[in-house]
Amino acid sequence: MRRIAHGRRSRLFVVVPLLVVFGGDANLPYLHVPIRSSGLRLAEGGQTGITHIVQAATSTARQGAYYLPNGYESRPLPLMVSFHGTGGKGSLMILRLQALAEREGFMVLAPDSVSVAGVWSVGQQPEDMTEDYRHVMDCVREVLRVPGVRIDAARVLAAGFSVGGNVAPYIATRESLFTAFAVLHGHVMPGALGRLRPRVWLSTGDRDRVRTVEYMRSVAGHLTAEGFPSVELRVFKVDHSLGDDELAALVAWWLGRH
């Protein structure tokens, strides 16, 4: 199935019947936010979840962060693993996503890339496994070991923005943990695809000149030809950036609430 839809600020409409967020080469500024590894209670806007820095570290001493919504111990929850854009960090992605995660009831893990420039490395061949890949999976295993954490195994999403978009299919087509991946204003390298075929979300902006609508349509066509059974393509009224509407639509699609 392949659908293409255009989004507005308040709603989406079909034109033709595949998270952070993801800070970096979008329009997110650098913020220096201290997050204690012991956990930070968030009181703003009634949020009471907990943010942690991951203990797993890359060879460049970069780590990442994760967010557990209020009451996470009480039931299995969906998990989003999100990948930042150029110049980004996981902690910035958590800041972008935590309110949505709290409201919709899912956990977010946002690893840092190995590169201090905030770019990601993906394999060029099916058997290639980069340090970024290993770090992401180390972070995932760390979160799954947290006391009280249980995942909803039917709803595990890998989502990446811009240059981080390529990491989502690279990992989600190799790791059976993931049931879907999302590429937001990003690209997909055909050689980086593994053998698994989870659900796919693709999105971009009608004014995005970095990842144009035409390019994302070509990605959707390629993935469909590669045997992905469900590819969702959405177009929003934005440039190369992420708005609340796009993130909310992604989560609704992922969690089956649209």
What positions do the PLM features span?
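A domain-start/cap signature at the N-terminus of enzymes
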Residues: 6, 13, 17-79, 159, ...
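Serine-hydrolase catalytic machinery in alpha/beta-hydrolase-like enzymes
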Residues: 49-68, 78-149
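Alpha/beta-hydrolase fold active-site loops
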Residues: 78, 198-199
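Alpha/beta-hydrolase
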Residues: 81-83, 184, 236
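Cell-envelope and extracellular/periplasmic
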Residues: 84-86, 144, 161-163, 168, ...
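Alpha-helical scaffolding within the catalytic cores
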Residues: 91-97, 184-193, 214, 218
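Primarily recognizes the serine-hydrolase "nucleophile elbow" in alpha/beta-hydrolase
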Residues: 154-196
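C-terminal catalytic histidine-bearing segment of alpha/beta-hydrolase fold enzymes
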Residues: 201-203, 213-258
